[in-house]
Amino acid sequence: ATLTVPTTVPSVSEDCEQLRKAFSGWGTNEGLIIDILGHRNAEQRNLIRKTYAETYGEDLLKALDKELSNDFERLVLLWALDPAERDALLANEATKRWTSSNQVLMEIACTRSANQLLHARQAYHARYKKSLEEDVAHHTTGDFHKLLLPLVSSYRYEGEEVNMTLAKTEAKLLHEKISNKAYSDDDVIRVLATRSKAQINATLNHYKNEYGNDINKDLKADPKDEFLALLRSTVKCLVYPEKYFEKVLRLAINRRGTDEGALTRVVCTRAEVDLKVIADEYQRRNSVPLTRAIVKDTHGDYEKLLLVLAGHVEN
């Protein structure tokens, strides 16, 4: 994780008082908001929201929404949410968008632990009064539907135990299906959607040793095929999440005009998880530190909070 929380944190009521102060008077004190929320973990932020509502009779998110704008507002609001609520919100937005939405749904389904995904589904129920599964079922079609529905519905085994005989059998099965271009075959999807990450890793290692190619190389038959691209991303998310997120960041930062949506999503969903590993991968791949790339591509309070969440320490 890259989030830094001070060893001694002020009391929750003090944090709330300071936030209230940041909203009062002429203009908003964005620096104060960054100093407080940018250095509190999920549990602390939840407590701040609860206490703020009890003390001032107003939802902190509504107060922030009124005071802030643009990319900075989006980053603060997403960051202030509980991780499960945030995933529910991102997933719900994804079911309403036609572009890149499949990727966001797959990312949430494959890079969260079994319990995190379960909590996201529960948060979805609470927030939208329906299930994530029914929205995904309703908004996706064809092969995308076939892959995404079992992915968002899954509850994978999390242990390290691996069945090597099964890994061998399923590597052979995957190789046969892929050789026959049966990419959306039930068996391919079953393996990716139900097996534990450790088991999938063993299967894919066996695949490479036995058939000479990384599975994602064999899934590159048609670079323009969007389903194949999603399948490759699924494999990456399950086995090398840091490589997947590095690529999302690289594409977000390197395009003409930054994709702030993707940059915001990755930084605020991974800052408490593995953003350090992702940043190391980014530097290895691009020979530039992630924080420097952020400085070059963003500005103002948005840039400041991104840097704080990415663990940047000002000298």
Curated annotation (Swiss-Prot):
- Residues annotated as binding Ca(2+) 1 are F23, G25, G27, E67
Q: Where is this protein chiefly located?
A: membrane
Question: Has the keyword Calcium been applied to this entry?
Answer: yes
Q: Which amino acid positions bind Ca(2+) 3, per UniProt?
A: V295, T298, E303
Which regions are annotated as Annexin repeats?
10-81, 82-153, 165-236, 240-311
GO molecular function terms noted in the UniProt entry? calcium ion binding; calcium-dependent phospholipid binding; phosphatidylserine binding
- What does the UniProt entry say about where the protein is found? Membrane
Membrane-crossing residue ranges in chain numbering: none
Quaternary structure, from the entry? Monomer. Trimer. Oligomerization is calcium-independent. Disassembly of the oligomers seems to be required for calcium-binding.
**Domain text:** A pair of annexin repeats may form one binding site for calcium and phospholipid.
User: Function of this protein?
Assistant: Binds to phospholipid vesicles in a calcium-dependent manner in vitro. Prefers phosphatidyl-serine containing membranes. May have a role in the membrane cytoskeleton scaffolding or exocytotic processes. May be involved in oxidative stress response.
The family assignment reads: Belongs to the annexin family.
Q: What is this protein called?
A: Annexin Gh1
Organism name: Gossypium hirsutum (Upland cotton)
